């Protein structure tokens, strides 16, 4: 990838005064584009925590989110920064209409792994472009990778490929993509990694039809209803962490749904634990 990456203020709106955006970056493999969004703390001479995150358009601005709901991450970060005195640089990569292939680290054997290519582009090209623009380094910075749904799979895979991202936040990972490949991949995580794994218990609404009519019934999952199916899949990921002696901190919400509102509640708690 030899594309020029440039940055500008995200908006003239004062609510986004510390948010910046890149030009569109073309992914020739899938004929689609991504953008880089980054949020700077008030003092960025030293960065305590970097969070590299997927679906960046859902973090700060409701007008760009897929479903009109956002993490409202700026308020979450200010709460954490004020309480703990540790700052955060957020680098979010936007997704696109081919998210289902760009965010699937476990394609069929005869298919190109566009997700791995995307992750490598992000870490080897997108991330350095932000650091160069800000003229900062990540020396003594806690490097975190985060994502939700398919982004939850991407966060795990990112740490496998680039173990400097020792802290992983995986929210409601979409385990059924290539299942059970993610279970088998957990063993490839660094033993120094820590994964904060979350799911809600009311996430089955995303499937539309009953899961027994969608997925192979011989999967070792709970097909009694869609909510239990989702929970059982994420629980199997947690069990794979345990059986492979990888550190995992698992949490759930009884009424948690598959949306940014529930994930925002979860990530506030996770960040409080993480730092």
Language-model-detected regions and their locations in the chain:
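Catalytic active-site module of serine/aspartate enzymes centered on a nucleophile-bearing elbow/loop
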Residues: 266-275
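The feature captures the conserved acid-bearing segment of alpha/beta-hydrolase catalytic domains
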Residues: 176-255
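A domain-start/cap signature at the N-terminus of enzymes
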Residues: 1-49, 85-88
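Catalytic histidine-centered segment of alpha/beta-hydrolase-like enzymes
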Residues: 257-264
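Active-site machinery of serine-nucleophile hydrolases
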Residues: 57-120
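Short beta-strand element of the alpha/beta-hydrolase
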Residues: 46-59
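Primarily recognizes the serine-hydrolase "nucleophile elbow" in alpha/beta-hydrolase
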Residues: 139-191
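Gly/Ser-rich "nucleophile elbow"/oxyanion-hole loop immediately N-terminal to the catalytic nucleophile
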Residues: 105-149
């Amino acid at each position: 990838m030899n594309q020029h990456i440039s940055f500008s203020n995200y908006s003239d709106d004062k609510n986004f005064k510390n948010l910046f955006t890149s030009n569109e970056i073309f992914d020739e493999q899938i004929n689609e584009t991504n953008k880089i969004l980054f949020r700077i703390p008030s003092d960025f001479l030293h960065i305590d925590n970097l969070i590299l995150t997927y679906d960046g358009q859902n973090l700060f601005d409701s007008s760009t989110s897929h479903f009109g709901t956002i993490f409202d991450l700026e308020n979450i970060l200010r709460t954490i920064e004020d309480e703990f005195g540790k700052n955060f640089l957020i680098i979010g990569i936007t997704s696109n209409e081919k998210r289902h292939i760009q965010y699937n680290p476990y394609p069929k054997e005869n298919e190109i792994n566009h997700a791995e290519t995307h992750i490598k582009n992000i870490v080897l090209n997108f991330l350095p472009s932000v650091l160069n623009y800000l003229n900062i380094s990540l020396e003594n910075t806690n490097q975190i990778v985060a994502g939700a749904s398919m982004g939850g799979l991407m966060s795990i895979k990112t740490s496998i490929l680039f173990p400097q991202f020792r802290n992983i936040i995986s929210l409601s990972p979409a385990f059924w993509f290539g299942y059970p490949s993610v279970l088998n991949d957990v063993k490839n995580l660094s033993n120094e990694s820590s994964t904060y794994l979350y799911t809600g218990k009311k996430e089955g609404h995303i499937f539309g039809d009953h899961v027994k009519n969608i997925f192979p019934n011989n999967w070792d999952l709970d097909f009694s209803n869609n909510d239990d199916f989702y929970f059982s899949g994420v629980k199997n990921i947690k069990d794979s962490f345990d059986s492979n002696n990888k550190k995992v901190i698992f949490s759930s919400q009884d009424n948690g749904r598959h949306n940014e509102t529930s994930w925002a509640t979860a990530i506030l708690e996770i960040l409080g634990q993480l730092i």
